A protein has these predicted regions:
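Active-site entrance/lid segments in N-terminal catalytic domains of soluble metabolic enzymes
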Residues: 1-206
Length: 206
């Protein structure tokens, strides 16, 4: 087909048993890729991403929760001290915030597309790895269509979700920058008996 006559509707993105328009957008945080962007992509039949970066802050803005204020009060005694290793969110708070953000988006979703969450292994927060299983499983429990794993090797992420009832039903993928990183992820994740539904390659040679 000549490129000058090609249209988006001439192509399809297939993830498992789901056929989609070739649109995959979003994932930037904090709330840069908004729920509105993700919902519009899904309405059009593609894939829209929300971000899991600082869901506590996003939840406070959207739903009137007080996760950030409560953390500030709790960590006030450590203000001015370094290192700030004790200034962190309680994992259960991150779990609740993630659940609220995802549930809200999924309740609003229309169209034949999907809404994913971009889940980063490394975040600019103390001990982000400790919150990772809470973030992953909260998103699944809240009904997210899929998860894109990014910002890290995620060698434990599939294992963290393996007992979740939606682990084998949600679309799960990984963002990598090299074949080496992908091979490491596949080797570790294969122990769960589950392979990723998709791989996103981002690098100068992609």
């Amino acid at each position: 087909m000549p490129l000058n006559s090609a249209r988006m509707n001439d192509y399809r993105l297939v993830l498992g048993d789901k056929e989609l328009k070739p649109i995959m957008v979003g994932g930037m945080g904090v709330n840069i890729s908004t729920r509105e962007l993700a919902l519009e992509a899904a309405r059009l039949g593609g894939v829209g991403h929300i971000s899991d970066a600082l869901t506590a802050d996003v939840s406070d803005r959207l739903f009137g929760t007080h996760f950030v204020k409560d953390k500030a009060k709790r960590c006030a005694p450590f203000s001015g001290l370094a290192p700030k290793t004790d200034m962190e969110f309680v994992p259960e708070e991150i779990e609740r915030a993630t659940h609220l953000c995802v549930e809200d988006v999924m309740n609003r979703k229309t169209g034949d597309g999907l809404v994913f969450i971009n889940c980063m292994e490394k975040l600019t927060m103390n001990d982000s790895f400790k919150t990772l299983p809470h973030r992953l499983n909260a998103a699944l429990d809240a009904g997210i269509d899929g998860i894109s794993l990014s910002a890290g090797l995620h060698i434990s992420s599939f294992a963290m979700m393996a007992e979740n009832k939606r682990f084998r039903h949600a679309k799960l993928g990984i963002v990598v920058s090299s074949v080496r990183a992908l091979n490491i992820f596949l080797k570790k994740s294969s122990r769960t008996g589950r392979l990723p539904d998709f791989v996103v390659v981002e690098s100068p040679l992609a």
